[in-house]
Amino acid sequence: MSQEVLSEKKKSGVKGRKALWIAIVSILVWLSIGGFAGGAFSKISTVQENDNSAFLPDSAESTIAGEVLVKFSSQDDQLFPALLLLLGDLNPATNAQAFEKVNQYSATLLSKTLPETEKPLSTYFAQGVPLTPIPSADGKAILINAQLDFAVADANVDGEPVFPKIIEFIREDMEKEFTSAGITTHVTGPAGLFADLFEAFGSIDTRLLQTTLIVVAIILIVVYRSPVLWILPLFTAASALGIATMIVYYLAREEIIDLNGQTQGILDVLVLGAATDYALLLIARYREELHHHQSRFDAMRIALRGVVEPIIASGSTVIAGLMVLLLSDLSSNRGLGPVGSIGIASSMLAVLTLLPALLIIFGRWIFWPKIPRFDDVDEKLSGLWSKVGNLVDRRPRAVWISTALALLIFAGFSTTLKSDGLSQSEAFTTRTDSVIGLERLGEHFPSGEGTPVEIVVDQADIASAAAAIGRVSTVASVVPLTNVDPLTQRPTSELKVVDGKVVLYATLKVAPDSAEGKESIPLIRQAAKAVNPNILVGGQSAIGYDVDQSSRRDNRVIIPIVLLLIAVILGFLLRSIFAAALLLGTVVLSFAATLGVCALVFDNVFGFAGTDAAFPLFAFIFLVALGIDYNIFLMTRVREESLKIGTRAGIIKGLTVTGGVITSAGTVLAATFGVLGILPLVFLAELGFAVAFGVLLDTIIVRSLLVPALVRQIGPKIWWPSKLQHQEN
């Protein structure tokens, strides 16, 4: 017997040394990759595309119109109006001195030098287009429409876009020139708004990432009550983000995928949240197995065997949902699909290779002060989750009916969610200079001044098209684009004709990016196409309208496909059609309830005007794909226990042993997405709240009460059509 014991110990020692070397090699490989990934973090912002082309539908009429409109200017790309607004006593009849000062300023502004590039501002604006001050009828405002050449201004200087620096320079210069004269200045319009968006996205690189890491670290310290253990899952999550960022950077640099600041922000919180979730699951199972195995190598082998299936199934579910975004009309949505999928794949890879290696290297002491000993102590059904399990076991019908009714009540409010889209001025949680300027502009000029609807028509149709468009109730004026006198640089009365076509500018009475402005587009298109079906309607309002329409189309197409894919994955994982349908139904109910709560909170607490048209789709992708994770973690363990002790005991045992870790995982994911709220962007703040609340709802109510109670009520038939359905309850 002693010889057999010695032989067994020798074999165990050989296996242990082999596992130790594998762990060391794994860590070295990850550290090597991390060295390459570090450079990608500092350069990722240089491959972002945050202009309208990053969101525009490829097949939209506004896209086609934009391609034609380029031919009417010497610039290679779209011109972005920067609206310089001056407010005060600017009536030439009563304050000729101030009016003349504005004239002189507009004549000399473009000759000033941008410090960052040491080039004159004229380099970045439309060539041959003078800055002409336009006084308001009430004499209290002057508007200067400066056409920014985005093809030039979008260049990078020292790794940062020069475009926002131009707007910042003009804002500071105008303030310096006019504040002493009692004149208030703003830079608004598309260029001003996008500069503020760039500034908001710029904080994603540092502020968002740092805050997320701090929040995750605090939660891990609270969960593990250990001064050292929290470092391993956090290091693993950071490593996963490093490799994901590196891959995304190189793919975006080669223009294989689209990346914008919004997508990068989502990538950061998604990877840190998902990787930490998977790490919590592995560490909990490893700690459990350390009680049953003297060798930490054997404990890790059994733990990996227990978690690899739910982690891969969970990650595959999220990846499947994200990759369906490739069917989107919007290039920004299509970009999120592969970017998010790379993040989830990196998270799974790190947790299943790097984290086990780290845990093996450090041994049991890493759990100090609560070091798990080899004592073969089974999980006792005690504590909070034992009480929850007993409640579900005693009164399953009362539990699932009450929770389902509560969810249905909140789901009823989902119909009140305003998802008609946000104007650019409503996109910020703070009042930026561009937002204030846009509001003040509407007080003194037609709201659409400086950002007209741009209509491409055949020269022969110009008169009839202008008349038809002018009859649209929201159109203030319609004027044609004319040539510029090369000597005076002033517009002439001669039409600018390119390939037999001309451009009409329709100024709206309403804000061009408002709901009313976007609703004007189908009316203008209808009026114009009655004259000639080949007329193209573009401009900022048309772009906004086309983006909203594509978002609604994506909701109709993508959501059903995602549901079908998740149902198939669940069916294969649980070997049960019934269980898959049940889990999917509960998560959809949870999603609807979350939308209902969002409708109430956004309107009555945060005071948001509504949501972006893409919000329901993004919320659905993350809530359903991530929300189903916790049911996967629960039900795979329930199935494992049901094979041993029956479905009734299995659901109680599964709930009890997974309750703590799943709730912790949900808290981490909710916190990481909640961090999106620190950014001054309404869309990300709303998405962060929706995912955070929805995940907590899933972990605390759906996974803890609704699903276990339903499974307890249904019994072994939940496993239909597998053989497990015939097992005694």
For every predicted segment, state its role.
Residues 1-49, 115, 137-139, 151, ...:
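Membrane-embedded transmembrane helical bundles of large multi-pass transporters/channels
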Residues 89-90, 384:
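N-terminal extramembrane/targeting module of integral membrane proteins
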Residues 29, 83-86:
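Short secondary-structure junction/hinge motifs that connect adjacent elements
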Residues 82-83, 402-405, 453:
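Short coil/turn segments at secondary-structure boundaries
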Residues 58-80, 90-188, 416-604, 608-610:
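Structured non-transmembrane domains adjacent to transmembrane bundles in polytopic membrane proteins
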Residues 52:
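N-terminal entry motif of extracellular EGF-like repeats
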